[in-house]
Amino acid sequence: MAIEQHIDGLLRHVGLRVDHGLTPVSASLVLLAGIGALSVGTFALRLVRLFADVYILPGNSVSKYGANKKDLTRASWAVVTGATDGIGREFALQLARKGFNIVLVSRSPEKLGSVAAEIEAATPGVRTKTQAIDFALGDERQYEGLEHTVKGLNVGVLVNNVGKSHNMPVTFTETSEEEMEDIIEINVVSVLRVSKMIIPGMVDRKRGLVLNLGSFAGQVTTPMLATYAGSKAFLSGWSQALGEEVKRSNVDVSLLNTYFVVSNLSKIRKSSAMIPTPKQYVTQVLKTLGRNGGAVGRPYTATPWPGHALVDWATTFVLPRGWLLSYTYGQQVATRKRALNKAHKAVKSA
């Protein structure tokens, strides 16, 4: 009788009508059916939410963060790190077209000058500033130079794009100290230091957007890229903590959970439905600001590209984590073998 009463209580709690003529076994089956229906419903709602975020629901307007195409003298500034190639360059170009003045931060003064000239030619009236920093060095004088460059600017957007991965998949024990330290200095330390420089002003002005370039390697931990994966996992947790801290000051934080994009970092040259060009990717990001996309249920995180969003949803809600680790390990081992073979052939033909 106690079991029957307990099941009755559970059924009432989930809103199911109780038939007191049911046996305990029958009632248990009804309860399990209810739980199953709830699980399937939740599963379906998450999928619907994904498609709505990616294809239907509008994102935040960039005017929320100070874009002003009509009067660029009153427009806010966007600071973009890693701004001379790939995704970073595309963010700089598109944010300028949206009505922001641009601070370009990257390693090469020559490339910085080239991208600044490109922006000013394409979007007359947009002002640019440049700052050369080799983030791997952790040079205090270079950080002071950036601080001087942004001092007094009304910065509405910060794009922490700069990043570094391993030259090829490698076990942690075989990773060189130089490569390991470069990855942490670029992917973690630079993000913290630049953000600490910029975000207090956003908080004071009660307006801002911080976009941190993440990676699937930080969500689905990637063997053979352990240090890189760990650096991106850090960004995921840090972005969520930061987002909660500054949201009451109207500063929006979003970790962009990114799968493959055509870029120097990914070493991929051909685009597809699953692998966008930087232009396609950034267009989608700016169109869906404030939406989670495939990062359903993860605060301050977005997976905006449709193909990436589906992979994110599947790896989160469908595929077993242990299987993913094993599969990813096998893929990275194969990638390493191909890279070593290619390097060996290059040496022989030299």
From Swiss-Prot:
PROSITE patterns: ADH_SHORT. Pathway: Lipid metabolism; fatty acid biosynthesis. The chain crosses the membrane at residues 28-48. Keywords: Endoplasmic reticulum, Fatty acid biosynthesis, Fatty acid metabolism, Lipid biosynthesis, Lipid metabolism, Membrane, NADP, Oxidoreductase, Transmembrane, Transmembrane helix. GO terms for molecular function: ketoreductase activity; very-long-chain 3-oxoacyl-CoA reductase activity. It is a single-pass membrane protein. The active site is at 228 (proton donor), 232 (lowers pka of active site tyr). Pfam families: adh_short (PF00106). Its main location: endoplasmic reticulum. The keyword DNA repair does not apply. Its EC number is 1.1.1.330. It is found in: Endoplasmic reticulum membrane. GO terms for biological process: fatty acid elongation; sphingolipid biosynthetic process; very long-chain fatty acid biosynthetic process. One of its GO terms (cellular component) is endoplasmic reticulum membrane. It catalyses: a very-long-chain (3R)-3-hydroxyacyl-CoA + NADP(+) = a very-long-chain 3-oxoacyl-CoA + NADPH + H(+). NADP(+) binds at residues 79, 134, 161, 196, 228, 232, 261, 263. Belongs to the short-chain dehydrogenases/reductases (SDR) family. Component of the microsomal membrane bound fatty acid elongation system, which produces the 26-carbon very long-chain fatty acids (VLCFA) from palmitate. Catalyzes the reduction of the 3-ketoacyl-CoA intermediate that is formed in each cycle of fatty acid elongation. VLCFAs serve as precursors for ceramide and sphingolipids. This is Very-long-chain 3-oxoacyl-CoA reductase. It comes from Mycosarcoma maydis (Corn smut fungus).
